[in-house]
Every structure is written in C-alpha cells, then in structure tokens.
C-alpha cells in the first residue's frame, strides 16, 4: 500500500504540508529508502528540511552489484522484478518535444505513478539486500557509499561562489592575447585563414607550408590536426607552437572563463555541481 500527498507550488502552502512529514524525515533513527535518494534529499532541503538517518539507495546498491549495467528504475524493475513500470514520458511526453511538468498531469495519474515508484523502490531494496550480503559488499555500501550521499548532497546544495569580476578581467586579457596570437599565426603562415577550422589549419600546414610530406588524413579526407599530431610537429615550424597555444587559450576562454558565469544560479548566486555515484563502468 502506498500513499501520495500533492504538494502545491505556493511556498507557504507547501511548507504547511511538509511540516507534517518533517519529524519523520529528520528522525536520525529511521531508515530512508530511495532510488537516487540524493535527488530527494536536495528537493526537501530547499524547503528547510534536512533528511537524517540511515539510507538505502537502490540505484547505488545495483551499481555496486553490477557496475557495467544500467541503474534506472525502469530497467531494474523489468530485470529483477519482471515488472514494467509506468514511464514518466507517458505522463509528461518525450524529451524530444516540449515536456509538461508533473503539475500539468491529472493528480490521479501522478498518484498512481508516485505510489508505484515507492512500491518498486521498496521491492528493489528487499531484493538487493541479500545480494549485497552474499557478495560481501555490505561494509562498502553501508559504511562508505550511503554516508557519502549526504556529503555529496551537501556539496551540491552549498554550491561554489565565483569571482565574476576576476573572470571578466581574465576574459578581456585572454581575448587580447588571442588577437595577438592570431596576428602572429597569420604572419608565420603567410596568409589569413580560419584558425578554428581544423580543415583550413590542415590545408595551411600541409598544402601551403608543406611541413609534413606524408601527413595523416581522417576518414573524411581532411588532414588530421589533433593536439597529438601537432605536438609531434612542433619543432618543424614556429607556427605549430603558436597554433597549440592559441587552441589552449581558446578552450580556456570558451569552456571555463566565459562559460562558468552563465551557469550561476540566479537565486543563490552560485554554481551548483552535480555528482554521480553510479557512473557506468566500461
């Protein structure tokens, strides 16, 4: 038997409902069972509730037992319980299209989905518990992986503060440095070209400058200008070193310096990371 309690979007009303569950959720002695329970810990934390007590995460349990397999609930239910769950896409639509939110779905359907979710999670917990014991994984699971969930959840919730002023200054400095490098590369190459185009870089290095007679080509017929290839040819022409320096600064600028400020949460003013304990092992 499972129960579903709708929680309204309005914060004050939601707080009133969650207040009834707070003592149980914050009880340090009661076991909390979940599938990817870190997600649930973070959801209620936003409402001022800090879940406490021992945990049993069915996703992590399965990861320890079979790290090379998938760990989603739908897969686990079909594989170990021989049960086909209601897929969330059946309620809110496929990812390829504009999805609904669960608040857009009739409460009767949401209740059935949520109740099934809880029921399946409990059944999976009962299935995996003896498996962990049989494989000698109890200490790793209960003493390391489960406490780690609280640590990771706290790290994600706390977030990271960025010095946006310093990043902006670094962005300006790197942009200036890239423009200078661009001019130097054109002078060394004896022509202008798109430095960010691997195809054009290959044509300049191997057709125009002819720094390598037997240059390697990709399946598409273009010259390979990977970092590994260019490093081997660094001593053959000064433009190669400049190209490598340009690429390094360009990646630093686009991937970190300019990108990180865009990831700041407007509500907290911080970047909030996400840590995965169940990365598929290959």
Q: Positions of the model-derived regions?
A:
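Short, solvent-exposed loop/turn segments at secondary-structure junctions
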Residues: 38-40, 57
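Short Gly/Thr/Asp-enriched flexible loops that form oxyanion-binding sites at enzyme active sites
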Residues: 40-48
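Conserved "right-hand" nucleotidyltransferase catalytic core of DNA-directed polymerases
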Residues: 1-9, 26, 35-37, 52, ...
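Short, basic/hydrophobic alpha-helical segments
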Residues: 13-29
């Amino acid at each position: 038997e499972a129960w579903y309690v709708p929680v309204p979007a309005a914060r004050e009303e939601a707080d009133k409902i969650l207040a009834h569950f707070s003592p149980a959720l914050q009880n340090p002695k009661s076991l909390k069972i979940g599938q990817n329970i870190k997600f649930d810990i973070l959801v209620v934390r936003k409402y001022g509730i800090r879940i406490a007590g021992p945990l049993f995460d069915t996703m992590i349990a399965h990861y320890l037992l079979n790290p090379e397999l998938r760990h989603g609930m739908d897969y686990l239910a079909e594989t170990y319980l021989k049960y086909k769950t209601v897929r969330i896409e059946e309620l809110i639509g496929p990812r390829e299209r504009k999805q609904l939110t669960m608040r857009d779905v009739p409460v009767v359907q949401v209740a059935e989905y949520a109740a099934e979710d809880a029921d399946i999670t409990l059944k999976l917990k009962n299935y995996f518990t003896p498996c962990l014991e049989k494989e000698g994984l109890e200490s790793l699971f209960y003493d390391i992986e489960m406490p780690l969930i609280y640590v990771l959840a706290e790290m994600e919730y706390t977030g990271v503060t960025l010095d946006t002023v310093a990043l902006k200054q670094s962005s300006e400095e790197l942009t200036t440095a890239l423009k200078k490098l661009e001019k130097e590369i054109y002078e060394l190459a004896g022509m202008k070209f798109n430095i960010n185009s691997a195809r054009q870089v290959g044509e300049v290095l191997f057709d125009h400058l002819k720094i390598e007679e037997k240059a390697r080509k990709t399946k598409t017929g273009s010259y390979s200008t990977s970092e590994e290839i260019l490093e081997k040819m660094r001593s053959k022409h000064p433009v190669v070193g400049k190209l490598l320096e340009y690429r390094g600064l360009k990646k630093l600028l686009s991937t970190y310096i300019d990108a990180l400020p865009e990831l700041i949460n407007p509500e907290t003013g911080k970047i909030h990371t996400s840590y995965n304990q169940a990365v598929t092992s290959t």
